[in-house]
Amino acid sequence: MRKLVVGSRRSKLALTQSQQFIDKLKAVDPTLEIEIKEIVTKGDRIVNKQLSKVGGKGLFVKEIQQELFDKEIDMAIHSLKDVPSIIPEGLTLGCIPDREVPFDAYISKNHIPLNELPDGSIIGTSSLRRGAQILSKYPNLEIKWIRGNIDTRLKKLEIEDYDAIILAAAGLRRMGWSDDIVTTYLDKDILLPAIGQGALGIECRSDDVELLELLSKVHNQAVANCVTAERTFLSAMDGSCQVPIGGYATNKENGEIEFTGLIMTPDGTKRYEHTEVGKNPVDLGEAVSRVLKEQGAYEIIKKLNEEQAH
C-alpha cells in the first residue's frame, strides 16, 4: 500500500479522532505509512458567530473535500454530523467505523440535575437542536449560545454565568474525559441526537480502489445502516444547522431498524416527531420525512431557510 495522507481539521478533537482511526487501520496492516495533514475549514475560522447564522452546508468539510479532489490528501476523517447528506460526485464515504455513544452529555455546576435547575438558569449550547428540545421540556430555563472546543466550554461553565452546558458525549469520550465530569447523559427521550452523532465518516475518492479495499476492513455495516436512515431523513427534509433537526436509528434484535426523526421551532414551542420500524434504511428515512411533512414540519424548515437567505 502506498503512503497515505489523511486530511483532518486541526482541532484537538479532530486530530485525536483521526489518530484513533489511523491506529485502527494500522491494527489491520501494521506496515501502513500514514501522515495527517491539518486543514483549516470555514467553520473553524468563524469563532464569533453562531453557526446557524452563518448559513450554508459543509462548513467543516468543503476545504477538506477540495484537497481530496486536488489529490493533496487520500482520505478525510470527518465527524459524520458535519458532513452534508449529499456527497459530491467523485467522492464517497469509503467506510463508517464503529460508533461512539451518540447521546448528549449534560454538565452542570455542582452537578444539579436538569429537572432541578431553578427558573431562569442558563444552559450553554451552540446547537439549535439542543436548545429547542430543552426549551420544549423546560420552558423555565434560558438557552445561551456558547462556542469553542471542549476545554473552552468547560472553562466558560466554570467562570461565566452558565449554570450548565450540553456537549456531545462522543467528543468527551474520545478526548479521554472521565464520566466524573458528566452530571448525566441525556437519553433520546430527553434529547434526540443530531443526525450521525457519535459516528465518523471516512471520505475518499470514488475511484481509489486500493484504499476502498483497506477501508472495507474497518467498516461497520450495522452502524452504516443506522446513519443511512438518519442521513436520508436529513436530505429529504433539506435539513442543515439552521434548523432544529434530530434523528436517531438503532438496530433491533430481529434485524429491523427503528428510526425517529424530529423537527422543531428554535423556541421549542412546535415539535414534530415520528418513529418508524423497518428493514430498509433509505425507505425508513423517507417514510419519517413524509409523515413530518404531512404534519406541517416542512413549513418550519422553509421559513428558517428563507430567513437565512435574507
From Swiss-Prot:
- Pathways per UniProt: Porphyrin-containing compound metabolism; protoporphyrin-IX biosynthesis; coproporphyrinogen-III from 5-aminolevulinate: step 2/4
Q: Which InterPro entries would you find in this protein's record?
A: HemC (IPR000860), Porphobilin_deaminase_cofac_BS (IPR022419), Porphobilin_deaminase_N (IPR022417), Porphobilinogen_deaminase_C (IPR022418), Porphobilinogen_deaminase_C_sf (IPR036803)
Keywords, A to Z? Porphyrin biosynthesis, Transferase
In the UniProt record, the gene name given for this protein reads hemC
One BP annotation, GO: protoporphyrinogen IX biosynthetic process
Query: How many and how are cofactors bound here?
Result: Binds 1 dipyrromethane group covalently.
Q: Report the EC code(s) recorded for this entry.
A: 2.5.1.61
Does the keyword Nucleus feature in the UniProt annotation? Answer: no
Disulfide linkages recorded for this protein, renumbered to the chain, are none
Please, what other remarks does the record include? The porphobilinogen subunits are added to the dipyrromethane group.
**What is the recorded function of this protein according to its Swiss-Prot or TrEMBL entry?**
Tetrapolymerization of the monopyrrole PBG into the hydroxymethylbilane pre-uroporphyrinogen in several discrete steps.
Which positions bear S-(dipyrrolylmethanemethyl)cysteine? C241
**A Pfam family assignment:** Porphobil_deamC
Would you tell me the Gene Ontology cellular component terms?
cytoplasm
Question: NCBIfam families of this UniProt entry?
Answer: hemC
Looking at the record's lineage, which domain of life comes first?
Answer: Bacteria
Give the family from UniProt.
Belongs to the HMBS family.
**Provenance organism:** Staphylococcus haemolyticus (strain JCSC1435)
Q: What is this protein called?
A: Porphobilinogen deaminase
Molecular-function annotations in GO: hydroxymethylbilane synthase activity
The entry describes its oligomerization and partners as: Monomer.
Chemical reaction(s) catalysed: 4 porphobilinogen + H2O = hydroxymethylbilane + 4 NH4(+)
